[in-house]
């Protein structure tokens, strides 16, 4: 994490990430547990400050911010469609045969692992879905089906708000 937290590389689909989101989102481990482990590790190994701060910020800052957005605005987000997008999703979105290599790679990651790097989700998958004018509820359904860390409180603000700007 830190310097390369937003880097995407086809040789390593996790790359500088813990991939703990399924465990956190399902309630199997808590953010508090993770932060304690990270801080304990930092005491003995001295993690670079930007890496430590970036990781802690993501685990407790961003996650909790998204949860607050969901609790406060989920109804509006789930019914919003600011750009009036109404296209359906083609079969290629489910098998990774769109013909766009970065998109197909991201789809196949989701199919193979049930998980994708946050940049793949936001900058590749969501961005292209938005450019293709796919209906937000269809995009939301796709994300809920494809990822093991999918949960309403996570996907509603990330898909409707961050990914599609549909709210």
Task: Label the model's feature ranges.
Residues 125-129:
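Alpha-helical support elements that line or immediately flank enzyme active sites
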């Amino acid at each position: 994490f830190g310097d390369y937290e937003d880097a995407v590389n086809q040789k390593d689909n996790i790359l500088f990430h813990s991939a703990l989101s399924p465990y956190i989102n399902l309630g199997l481990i808590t953010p508090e547990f993770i932060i304690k482990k990270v801080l304990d590790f930092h005491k003995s190994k001295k993690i670079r400050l930007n890496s430590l701060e970036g990781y802690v910020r993501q685990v407790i800052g961003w996650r909790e911010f998204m949860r607050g957005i969901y609790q406060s605005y989920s109804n509006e987000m789930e019914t919003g469609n600011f750009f009036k997008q109404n296209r359906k999703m083609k079969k290629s979105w489910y098998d990774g045969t769109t013909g766009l290599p970065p998109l197909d790679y991201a789809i196949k990651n989701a199919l193979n692992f049930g998980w994708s790097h946050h940049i793949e989700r936001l900058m590749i998958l969501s961005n292209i879905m938005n450019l293709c004018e796919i209906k937000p509820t269809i995009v939301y359904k796709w994300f809920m089906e494809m990822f093991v860390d999918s949960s309403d409180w996570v996907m509603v603000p990330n898909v409707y708000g961050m990914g599609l700007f549909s709210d």
